[in-house]
Design a protein with these regions (language model features):
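Conserved, function-critical positions that sit in or immediately flank catalytic
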Residues: 138, 142-246
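Tryptophan-rich substrate-binding surfaces of secreted polymer-degrading and adhesive proteins
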Residues: 1-183
Length: 246
């Protein structure tokens, strides 16, 4: 409710001992939810601070860019039966599909496979672009997400966590590209996977219309050496027209 207030307090200046509150300083007791314990917490308070809306932020696990690291690519259906393609994470939460750079820019990995071998590859070049247009950097296909503000860095960025925020330009571009003001109702096609290159195909460039719940998607399929090339930046298979509503 609008009239509710939250506070963070400090207390318990004396050591934890088995003869008083139980446990020890290195292994404090598990908090108990009862009236006696609640009263004790109030009695031991030394100071408190009111928490304003600007003192709270949504955070995610911090994943710092390190040159030469192989990151996962984003997949919406990561599970025990479909593990992440590099880290073998079994959930999106544990997948390493994003990272923060030395300039506090955050990027999402849309594709991490080598266009020649189809295997995962390390990312050596630190990206710097801030355009909402997706770009290839060091063989990775990346989406710029946002840059942390000075305030967010000083208040919420730690060794373990980083703020999850929104860049209005990026979100507006995503909504526009989806053809809908609610981008989660559908989106353009950014990436596709070649699960098998096959063999014996006539060399050349071909185009295939994407069948599905969206419209306008067209794939450019390049055959070289009588095999379908993997998705990549240039001279290989790629998305000719992203379409919308998928």
């Amino acid at each position: 409710e609008s009239n509710e207030h939250y506070y963070m307090f400090l207390g318990k200046s004396s050591p934890f001992t088995s003869g008083t509150s139980g446990g020890s300083d290195t292994s404090p007791p598990t908090p108990v939810d009862d009236i006696t314990s609640e009263n004790y917490r109030y009695d031991s308070m030394l100071g408190l601070n009111k928490i304003a809306s600007t003192d709270v932020a949504r955070v995610i696990n911090r994943r710092t860019f390190v040159s030469g690291t192989t990151y996962d690519m984003y997949e919406h259906n990561i599970s025990t039966s479909n593990v992440a393609n590099n880290s073998s994470a079994t959930s999106l939460f544990d997948s390493t599909f994003y990272f923060i750079t030395s300039e506090h820019k955050v990027y999402k990995v849309l594709y991490n496979l080598n266009s020649s071998t189809g295997n995962t590859q390390a990312l050596s070049s630190e990206p710097t672009f801030t355009s909402p247009v997706k770009q290839f950097v060091g063989g990775y296909y990346l989406q710029y997400m946002y840059t942390l503000s000075t305030s967010e860095i000083s208040k919420f960025l730690t060794t373990d966590f980083m703020p999850a925020t929104t860049d209005s330009t990026v979100s507006s571009a995503a909504a526009s590209a989806s053809g809908d003001t609610a981008p989660f109702n559908g989106a353009p096609i950014d990436v596709f996977l070649v699960t098998s290159q096959g063999s014996g195909y006539p060399n050349g460039t071909y185009y295939a219309k994407v069948q599905g719940d969206g419209t306008g998607g067209i794939l450019k399929i390049v055959v070289s050496g009588n095999a379908i090339t993997y998705f990549g930046e240039s001279g290989v298979s790629t998305v000719q027209a992203a379409g919308s509503g998928y």
